[in-house]
Every structure is written in structure tokens, then in C-alpha cells.
A protein has these predicted regions:
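Short beta-strand-loop/turn "lid" adjacent to the catalytic site in phosphate-handling enzymes
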Residues: 50-101, 105-114, 131, 260-263
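Short, glycine/charged-enriched secondary-structure capping and boundary segments
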Residues: 19-20, 73-76, 110-112, 145-148, ...
Length: 310
């Protein structure tokens, strides 16, 4: 019968049915703002399925810390109980995972056609891996192999304090502290962060993330500069994670922004910044970095998790 799998972001939710063997079917996307809560959104998806295809269990990925039965999402005003959600949807079990745990569990099932390597390095089989991805927020996770199985290590790495690497970034971070109090990595490396960077580099011009995206697509010099700074900052965070995990299995860049701009990412200062760690430059030069170009990697990761924990 399969599992309900759902990737619940701050803006959109994608639902599907995971079949035995890891196949993902019946993928549907929803705008979160069109529903008062997650229960109504998932009920809409399940209600459209033929009764014989309705699953009895679910694995859901959530863009929020998971510290118990009650979950409070960060980038949308949704709070819910996992046990109550299962009862409301008539499911025997609902397993919540951090959204980037789902991304991490996808890494072992991605093929070369799902990835675009940027820079050098060769992955070491079964070594730790890292995934980081800017979108509505900035997600991070590690993946380590213990006793023959992969285990995701999640946290809130997007909220670490952003450290500047040059005078221009120092000015940007100072503006971030003025605006937000604490200038975390997510304040600069996310959709809203890209818009903030554009304003910081252009006399405070206020644009939405979508408007900055339009200017990037049009080839505007100022927008492309903001994107390059964005990718360099991402390089700083990615290399910090690579050092923390000794991620010789590779660093994978996901999220909704980078895969949209692969050409600009390849030409950016990301990899130079990634390796720019002084005495540890040779260490990082050996670690490969990839952009995840696969469709729905989180759903594939949830399917892999469901298969392993059926």
C-alpha cells in the first residue's frame, strides 16, 4: 500500500506515496498559505486518493526543530501535535523528520545524473556527508554510517552566527545586526537573505526575493553581484560543516535557490571560498561539492527512510 510522504517547507508542501522499493508516485504540490493548518492540507491530498490507495502510515519532513509531540514551524504560523495529526488523518503512525534529514537520507540513492559537481575532490565511500540548502530558510544536516546503516544528524545550523570573510561582508553583517539583532547565516543565505544582500549592496533598495530573481534572469549586474556574494557566503557555511563532520563523502547543495542558478554557481566564488581555510585548505580541497539537481530529493529521502524502517 505504501507510505504517505510529505515535504513540508515554509512556503510549499509536496506530498506523494512512497512504494516498496523506493518509488515515489502521485506527487502533488500545495501552497501552504491556502490552508489553515497542516492537517487540512494533508487531508486534501489523502481525500483525492482512491480509498484502496490510501496509506496507513506517514513520514513527514518539517522545516522546524523536532523536540517532542508538538511541533512549531519557523517560517509559517503552524503548530500541531504529531499524535493528533495521526488521529485526524486516520493513520496508524506518523513519523516526523527534520526537512534536511529527508535531504540527507536521499544522498545514498542519488545517481550521477542527479548531481552537478563543482570543483575537485573525490568522494570516499561510506565517509560522512553533509547537505546544506538555502530556500525559504537555510537547512543543514549530516549523514553518517553506523553499524551498516545511514543515520542523519540534524540541527539548526542555519542559525549559526554569520562570520564575514572580508571588509565588504563585514559591512553586510553589520547591517544585518542592525536589522535583526543577531545576523545568522539564514538571514543572508536564503530567499529573503538574497533580497537583503541586494539592498545592502545597492544603497538600501528594497526588493522581494522574486524581484531579485527576475533581475538575475535578466542579467542585471547588481543582481548577479548579490548572487555571487550569496554563493560565497554559502561557501563559508558549507566549508564549516565539512570541517565539523570531516565530510569526505562530499558536501551536497540543495534547497530551492542554487539548483535554479547552476551556471552562475559554477562561475561564482563558492569553491574558492569553500577551500579558503588557511592550514586546512588541502583538507577541504579533497572534499567534493555537488549541486543536487534531482527532482524532489526530499521525497526520495523520505521514501528511502520509510523503506529502511518499514
Amino acid at each position: 500500500m505504501g507510505w504517505l510522504v510529505a515535504d513540508i517547507g515554509g512556503t510549499n508542501t509536496r506530498c506523494a506515496i512512497a512504494k516498496p522499493g523506493g518509488a515515489v508516485e502521485n506527487i502533488e504540490a500545495f501552497r501552504n498559505r491556502e490552508f489553515p493548518g497542516l492537517d487540512r492540507l494533508l487531508a486534501a491530498y489523502l481525500g483525492a486518493l482512491p480509498p484502496r490507495e490510501r496509506p496507513e502510515e506517514a513520514v513527514i519532513a518539517i522545516a522546524a526543530p523536532i523536540r517532542g509531540d508538538e511541533i512549531r514551524m519557523v517560517n509559517i504560523n503552524w503548530t500541531f501535535s504529531v499524535s493528533a495529526l495521526a488521529r485526524t488523518l486516520s493513520l496508524k503512525r506518523v513519523i516526523p523528520l527534520n526537512d534536511f534529514a529527508a535531504q540527507a537520507y536521499a544522498l545514498p540513492v542519488l545517481g550521477s545524473h542527479d548531481l552537478c559537481q563543482v570543483g575537485g575532490g573525490q568522494a570516499v565511500d561510506r565517509a560522512p556527508r553533509v547537505v546544506v540548502g538555502p530556500g525559504t530558510g537555510l537547512g543543514t544536516a549530516g549523514l553518517v554510517r553506523v553499524a551498516g546503516r545511514w543515520h542523519a544528524i540534524t540541527g539548526e545550523g542555519g542559525h549559526v552566527t554569520m562570520a564575514p570573510s572580508d571588509e565588504r561582508e563585514a559591512r553586510i553583517v553589520a547591517l544585518g545586526r542592525e536589522r535583526f539583532g543577531h545576523c545568522s547565516a539564514e538571514r543572508l543565505i536564503s530567499g529573503a537573505g538574497l533580497a537583503f544582500l541586494y539592498g545592502a549592496l545597492n544603497a538600501g533598495i528594497v526588493l522581494t526575493p522574486a524581484e531579485v530573481g527576475t533581475r538575475i534572469e535578466a542579467g542585471e549586474t547588481a543582481a548577479l553581484e548579490a548572487l555571487d556574494v550569496f554563493f560565497q557566503l554559502l561557501g563559508t557555511v558549507a566549508s564549516n560543516l565539512a570541517l565539523t563532520f570531516a565530510a569526505f563523502g562530499g558536501v551536497y547543495i540543495g534547497g530551492g535557490i542554487t539548483p535554479r542558478y547552476v551556471e552562475q554557481f559554477q562561475a561564482s566564488g563558492f569553491r574558492t571560498r569553500f577551500e579558503d581555510k588557511g592550514r586546512y585548505r588541502p583538507f577541504l580541497a579533497d572534499i567534493p561539492t555537488w549541486v543536487i539537481t534531482a527532482d524532489q530529493p526530499a521525497l526520495r529521502g523520505l521514501a528511502a527512510y520509510a523503506e529502511a524502517n518499514a
